[in-house]
């Protein structure tokens, strides 16, 4: 007999070789009906795997986070099985679970169509209805390689060859379909939900490397309940309507083109938004005691080697071949294989330390809060680029706080206050905090880590904020906080960060004179609120569906005339608004008023000032607000006051 320890701490005895299925069934039939896998000693395994030693056992139900992930993993395998049946010449590659769904990569000459997805979905429903057993088998490496070679599944062969010799080769069989997989899975295909949807097809490089062949990736989502699926599809539909790439084109904010992949061309209205945000942040950090600096965009390879970025980040850096540059100053190479002396900065921190080191610092100078709207460049594979959300050139609202260990808590509290105010002003009142503690491989002593972790946690607790812990997810040089905001359709975006760093001050020889007169290393707090301006603007566009609040709108008021008699009054009002630093545009064309209103509302202009003969004679303004059919009659001074009241 063996002891089985249950989640409530109680211990029951079972025969050696008992399965998780038998244990859960003996405890509760209602629990068993919802269980699709078990957790044995903190490891997820299939329900029918024998247990031969004393173990802790926990049921994984279909309505749990882990259960939903297994359900989605099952659905990915069923997708692959359906594709193999319908399109036998297709090679199946990999099919992991992702946030809210799954995908499976396929190698196939002919592209999948939307009609194909419909046929595949029906075949998947048929597979679920058959309720075939899903069985795990362990094969010898040679047998697995030979089997998949015979099946002409050459990607599976490559995957098996990459599995370490110490690991077993696990295979899952359902019906006549066999796939390489670690598992776990449900007991049969009938456990899998019928509430799934294949959402799209896209290209994906094998292994994410642009030098490799392009595969076809079918994305899908799966949920326990129909209501959950419907809710997700509604959010997906809303997200498509709000897509910042589409709105960016329609509103003439920015565009991308092949000659500068991943680098936005900002149009006047988009650049206006950019400048508004920059000016706002600049004012906020000035009030919070930051100094604002600017550091070179191109820095020597030697500095990047000292900082450690060259070793760890080189593949993501754009480099400049100075030998070639002497002949052609415009030629910049991004090949990492070329020995280069200069690199475009991917981050601002080494430059900030150069400014810190330029003069001798005393403990009285700390904390020193140094900010920069630094223009950075990072190489991202072309397949990973995604509008403003994933770019190669970007501006960060970056800052570094040079402080002592004893100042970490106070500086964290001050930063959190600043961050929450900024998010509130931009329309994101809810902020989630994640705390990432020490990883297994790390720099610094346990004593330093203890102090830094306790300082961050004490700051969060002092603020009365809830937080979740990401065990072992801190950087090797220090613990960190991540700040996540939620948009209008419930999506979460990680934007803000605060990262404690013990390592960079040592590498770049940053020091200050302590109260005892000795040299000491400062702690650096890397922190950002928005992250990159580009990504944050993309988030704002989608959050507001392009209808930015008055203070952020590139055009705040459109002044339009109805009749020729009102043209001079319209010009006068337009100029008055401009003189009061209000972003106004003027339309005195002969187009019909409904056409003008429709055009400006399509352009998401918050306010339209409509002027006819009546308004011209009275000196009043008929105001229409975006999304409203009603008109309000006010004076120009009232309009100006209204807009100023909304200014942040």
From Swiss-Prot:
> EC number(s) per UniProt?
6.1.1.3
Q: Where does Zn(2+) bind?
A: 349, 400, 526
Enumerate the residue ranges of region (Catalytic): 243-549
Which of UniProt's keywords are assigned here? Aminoacyl-tRNA synthetase, ATP-binding, Cytoplasm, Ligase, Metal-binding, Nucleotide-binding, Protein biosynthesis, RNA-binding, tRNA-binding, Zinc
**Any single GO BP term:** threonyl-tRNA aminoacylation
Subcellular location, record wording: Cytoplasm
A GO term for molecular function: ATP binding
Q: Which cofactor does it need?
A: Zn(2+)
Q: Which Pfam families match?
A: HGTP_anticodon, tRNA-synt_2b, tRNA_SAD
Q: How is the cofactor bound?
A: Binds 1 zinc ion per subunit.
* Enzyme class, UniProt record, top EC level: ligase
Q: Which reaction does it catalyse?
A: tRNA(Thr) + L-threonine + ATP = L-threonyl-tRNA(Thr) + AMP + diphosphate + H(+)
Q: Which GO terms describe its cellular component?
A: cytoplasm
Looking up HAMAP family in the UniProt record yields: Thr_tRNA_synth (MF_00184)
Q: What is this protein called?
A: Threonine--tRNA ligase
Species the sequence originates in: Orientia tsutsugamushi (strain Boryong) (Rickettsia tsutsugamushi)
């Amino acid at each position: 007999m063996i002891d089985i320890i249950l989640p409530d701490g109680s211990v029951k005895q079972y025969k050696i070789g008992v399965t998780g299925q038998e244990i859960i069934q003996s405890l509760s039939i209602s629990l068993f009906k919802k269980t699709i896998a078990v957790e044995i000693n903190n490891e997820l395994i299939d329900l029918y795997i024998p247990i031969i030693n004393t173990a802790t056992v926990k049921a994984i139900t279909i309505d749990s986070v882990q259960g939903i992930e297994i359900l989605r993993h099952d659905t990915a395998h069923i997708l692959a099985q359906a594709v193999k049946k319908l399109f036998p010449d297709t090679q199946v590659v990999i099919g992991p679970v992702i946030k809210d769904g799954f995908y499976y990569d396929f190698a196939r000459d002919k592209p999948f169509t939307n009609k194909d997805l419909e046929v595949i979905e029906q075949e998947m429903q048929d597979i679920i209805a058959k309720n075939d057993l899903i069985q795990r088998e362990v094969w010898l490496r040679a047998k697995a390689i030979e089997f998949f070679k015979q099946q002409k599944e050459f990607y599976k062969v490559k995957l098996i060859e990459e599995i370490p010799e110490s690991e077993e080769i696990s295979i899952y069989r359902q019906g006549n379909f066999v796939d390489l997989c670690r598992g776990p899975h449900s007991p049969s295909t009938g456990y899998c939900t019928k509430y799934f949807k294949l959402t799209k097809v896209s290209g994906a490089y094998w292994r994410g490397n642009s030098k490799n062949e392009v595969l076809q990736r079918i994305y899908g989502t799966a949920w326990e309940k129909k209501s959950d699926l419907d809710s997700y599809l509604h959010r997906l539909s809303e997200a498509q309507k709000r897509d910042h790439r589409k709105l960016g084109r329609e509103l003439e904010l920015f565009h991308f083109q092949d000659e500068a992949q991943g680098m936005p061309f900002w149009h006047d209205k988009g650049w206006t938004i950019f400048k508004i945000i920059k000016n706002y942040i600049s004012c906020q950090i000035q009030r919070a005691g930051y100094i604002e600096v600017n550091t070179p965009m191109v820095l020597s390879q030697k500095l990047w080697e000292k900082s450690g970025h060259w070793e760890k980040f080189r593949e993501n850096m754009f480099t400049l071949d100075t030998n070639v540059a002497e002949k052609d100053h415009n030629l910049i190479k991004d090949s990492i294989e070329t020995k280069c002396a200069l690199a475009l900065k991917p981050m601002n921190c080494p430059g900030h330390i150069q400014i810190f080191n330029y003069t001798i610092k005393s403990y009285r100078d700390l904390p020193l809060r140094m900010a920069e709207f630094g223009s950075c460049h990072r190489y991202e594979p072309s397949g990973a680029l995604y509008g403003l959300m994933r770019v190669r050139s970007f501006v960060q609202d970056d800052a570094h706080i040079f402080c002592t260990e004893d100042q970490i808590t106070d500086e964290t509290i001050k930063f959190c206050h600043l961050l929450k105010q900024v998010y509130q002003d931009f329309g994101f009142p809810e902020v989630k905090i994640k705390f990432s503690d020490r990883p297994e491989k790390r720099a610094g002593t346990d004593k330093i880590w203890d102090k830094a972790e306790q300082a961050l946690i004490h700051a969060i607790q002092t603020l009365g904020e809830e937080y979740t812990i990401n065990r072992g997810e801190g950087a090797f040089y220090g613990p960190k906080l991540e700040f996540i905001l939620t948009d209008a359709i419930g999506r979460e975006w990680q934007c803000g960060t605060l990262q404690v760093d013990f390592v960079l001050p040592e590498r770049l020889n940053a020091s200050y004179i302590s109260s005892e007169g000795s040299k000491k290393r400062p702690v650096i707090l890397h922190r950002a609120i928005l992250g990159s301006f580009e990504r944050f603007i993309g988030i704002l566009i989608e959050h507001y569906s392009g209808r930015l609040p008055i203070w952020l709108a590139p055009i705040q008021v459109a002044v339009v005339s109805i009749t020729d008699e009102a043209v001079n009054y319209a010009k006068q009002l337009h100029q008055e608004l401009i003189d009061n630093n209000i972003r106004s545009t003027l339309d005195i064309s002969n187009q019909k008023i409904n056409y003008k209103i429709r055009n400006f509302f399509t352009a998401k202009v918050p306010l339209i000032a409509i002027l006819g003969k009546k308004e011209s004679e009275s000196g009043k303004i008929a105001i229409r607000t975006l999304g409203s059919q009603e008109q309000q009659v006010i004076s120009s001074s009232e309009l100006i006051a209204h807009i100023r009241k909304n200014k942040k």
